[in-house]
Amino acid sequence: MLTLPKYLRSELKKPLGQLYKSIDIIEEKLHQQLSEDKLIISIGDATTKNLIKLNIQPQICIVDNKIEREPVEHKLTHTDNLVHVNNPAGCITDELVKICIDSINTATSNNPVIIEVKGEEDLAVLPCILNAPKDTFILYGQPKEGVVLVCVNEAFNKAKHFYKQLNKE
């Protein structure tokens, strides 16, 4: 298991990609990504919910059934392919990494995967960036600001830099 050192918390609160006020602004870009059969990974319940409202079905959705730490009930019904994993806040478990990699290798538009995290899913962005194809889009919410669009090829080195600084336990 990897844990987030306190000194990295403020750094990881900064967007790893381009921040947009709304998913609507990049809707066309996301539909294009799907039409080219390129991977979209959604991290977070609000982001996933907003994508599905726009009829954008990410091949991988990583959720924890909370929005801003408050329980949320939603119905992700675009797939029966549901995987459960425990991942404490401020951590990246080996199991989460394995499930992210397995999902990246198997998920398609016709076979999407929902990863339901018991704990917190926020740091899943790092193993996703490090293991996804370079043309993958990863989206996650930036609380009170909007949504972050991460282009893996642009964020890989930054994610690798952060990942190396996590504490191994």
UniProtKB/Swiss-Prot annotation:
It comes from the Archaea. GO terms for molecular function: GTP binding; kinase activity. GTP binds at residues 45, 64, 66, 121. Keywords: Coenzyme A biosynthesis, GTP-binding, Kinase, Nucleotide-binding, Transferase. It catalyses: 3'-dephospho-CoA + GTP = GDP + CoA + H(+). Pathway: Cofactor biosynthesis; coenzyme A biosynthesis. PANTHER family: GTP-DEPENDENT DEPHOSPHO-COA KINASE (PTHR40732:SF1), UPF0218 PROTEIN TK1697 (PTHR40732). This is GTP-dependent dephospho-CoA kinase. It comes from Methanosphaera stadtmanae (strain ATCC 43021 / DSM 3091 / JCM 11832 / MCB-3).
